[in-house]
From Swiss-Prot:
This is Prothymosin alpha. The modification Phosphoserine is found at residues 2, 9-10. Pfam families: Prothymosin (PF03247). The modification N6-acetyllysine is found at residues 15, 103. It comes from Rattus norvegicus (Rat). Residues 43-84 have a biased composition (Acidic residues). Residues 1-112 are annotated as: Disordered. GO terms for molecular function: DNA-binding transcription factor binding; histone binding; histone chaperone activity. Residues 13-31, 101-112 have a biased composition (Basic and acidic residues). Covalently linked to a small RNA of about 20 nucleotides. The modification N-acetylmethionine is found at residue 1. The gene is Ptma. The modification N6-succinyllysine is found at residue 15. The modification N-acetylserine is found at residue 2. InterPro entries: Pro/parathymosin.
Length: 112
């Protein structure tokens, strides 16, 4: 059993050394390590960055298409309801506070 543990730790160390070596090589070549911390070759890093940009553009494009395809009234109606809901709750909370203050004032007035 102890042999397996030693083998596993040596594999991790080798992997770490390879990653550090790649990072050092990239730094020497004037390239920074990828932001995600994974040392990758230049081609893979560029492909991943391009894919992330494409996904963001696609997501933004889909939202615009949905707005154009659907009736604006339905979507706007939902948004208005959501916007009004928190405001209504705040008003209700304020009313409760006012009631408490009014009761306190009445008690004070009665005592005088």
């Amino acid at each position: 059993m102890s042999d397996a543990a030693v083998d596993t730790s040596s594999e991790i160390t080798t992997k770490d050394l390879k990653e550090k070596k790649e990072v050092v090589e990239e730094a020497e070549n004037g390239r920074d390590a990828p932001a995600n911390g994974n040392a990758q070759n230049e081609e893979n890093g560029e492909q991943e960055a391009d894919n992330e940009v494409d996904e963001e553009e696609e997501e933004g494009g889909e939202e615009e298409e949905e707005e154009e395809e659907g009736d604006g009234e339905e979507e706007d109606g939902d948004e208005d309801e959501e916007a009004e809901a928190p405001t209504g709750k705040r008003v209700a909370e304020d009313d409760e506070d006012d009631d408490v203050e009014t009761k306190k004032q009445k008690k004070t007035d009665e005592d005088d």
